[in-house]
Each structure stands twice: as C-alpha cells, then as structure tokens.
C-alpha cells in the first residue's frame, strides 16, 4: 500500500489557497493510487509547542534513561516522526510569511529532525526512498525570472531541510501571486486552475 502524508499549515480553512491546492493534489493522487492511504497532519489542530528546555533535556538524554516526564515531552515528536517514516510521499502545504515558512511548520520541522531517527549520527539523512511535494502559496512571485527571486527563502529552506533528512526528490508547486485572490483580482477557482497542470504532474 502506498501512503501519503499531508502536512497542512494554513489557519484560513476553506479560504486557504494552499489547502485548496492540497484538495486538488489529493484527488489526483487518489485517482492514481486507488489502494493508497492518506494521513493528514493539520498543524492548526495539533498542540505543537516550540522547543524548550524540558524538550531539549529529554532529547539529549539516552532513551533508556528517560523518566515518564521525558517520555511525555517527546511523545508528540515521536508520533510526528512515525508518520513521516511510514509515508511514501510527503506533501507539505504551506503559505509564506515574510519570505519564510510559518512558525507552525518550523515547529513541525524542529520536531521531526531527530538524531538517530531521521538523521544519522554521521549527519546523513535516514528518511530515504521517499519523495516530497511542496504546495506553496505566496503573495509574491519568486519563480525563475522574477526580480525578487532571491527572497524565496521558504523554498530554499524546505529543500535544504528535506535533503538533510534524506529526501532528495522534492517537487515544488509554486502558487505565487496568491494575493490576487484576496484582492479579488481573480477567484480562488481560477487561481487554482492555473496551477492544476503542475499539481496533476506532482501527484502522478
């Protein structure tokens, strides 16, 4: 069975462009993988805390020495890592805030980059044999030829992090210019339609 893991980050529900991109992707993916299984991790519905001192203490303590409190501290991180390792295809659906990923996605990343689980002690990624698709909605346009292409920190960051943990096969579907929907210069449906060929190709 082929498994898809979808990580959602937008707080905007049905008004979210990245979530609408996800809907199109999942529909195409399910059509191509009739026996596939989809798991959705909605970061807006996950009590994901930023890393603090108790988490770090648990992280740097050998597992056989973990107290019940330490185990509880890492429980959600363990769950998120398990979801990632179980999937064949990872989808990260995200918006862009000030040129980079939102805080919730950064918190998810900090929870899944784990030495001995997703990253070897030699620095080599352990999440191999998988592919990833990034569905990104941004107000600005950062694709090839854009005068502000160098501001595309979000794409560079996600490619870097995914590569570090071992996922080299990364496709980015860039929904640049998404502010046109909020400014009512275009409709959500028309905007998503322009991205549909890229979404279909990524889901194949």
Curated annotation (Swiss-Prot):
Q: Which reaction does it catalyse?
A: 2 a quinone + NADH + H(+) = 2 a 1,4-benzosemiquinone + NAD(+); N,N-dimethyl-1,4-phenylenediamine + anthranilate + 2 NAD(+) = 2-(4-dimethylaminophenyl)diazenylbenzoate + 2 NADH + 2 H(+)
Gene symbol here is azoR
* Protein's name according to its UniProt entry: FMN-dependent NADH:quinone oxidoreductase
The record's section on PANTHER family has:
FMN-DEPENDENT NADH-AZOREDUCTASE 1, FMN-DEPENDENT NADH:QUINONE OXIDOREDUCTASE
**Keyword Signal carried by entry:** no
Cofactor binding note of this UniProt entry = Binds 1 FMN per subunit.
The entry's FMN-binding residues are: 10, 16-18
Keyword Acetylation assigned to the entry: answer is: no
């Amino acid at each position: 069975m082929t498994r898809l893991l979808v990580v959602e980050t937008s707080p905007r529900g049905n008004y979210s462009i990245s979530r609408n991109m996800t809907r199109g992707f999942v529909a195409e993916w399910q059509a191509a993988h009739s026996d596939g299984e989809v798991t959705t991790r909605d970061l807006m519905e996950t009590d994901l805390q930023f890393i603090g001192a108790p988490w770090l203490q648990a992280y740097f303590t050998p597992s056989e020495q973990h107290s019940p409190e330490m185990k509880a501290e890492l429980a959600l991180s363990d769950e998120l890592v398990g979801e990632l390792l179980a999937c064949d295809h990872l989808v990260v659906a995200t918006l862009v805030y000030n040129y980079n990923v939102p805080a919730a996605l950064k918190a998810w990343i900090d929870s899944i980059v784990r030495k001995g689980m997703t990253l070897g002690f030699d620095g080599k990624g352990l999440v191999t044999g998988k592919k990833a698709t990034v569905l990104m909605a941004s107000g600005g346009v950062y694709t090839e030829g854009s005068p502000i292409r160098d501001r595309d920190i979000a794409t560079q960051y996600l490619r870097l992090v995914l590569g570090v943990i071992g996922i080299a096969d990364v496709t980015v579907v860039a929904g640049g210019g998404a502010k046109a929907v909020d400014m009512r210069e275009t409709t959500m449906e028309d905007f998503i339609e322009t991205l549909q060929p890229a979404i279909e190709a990524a889901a194949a």
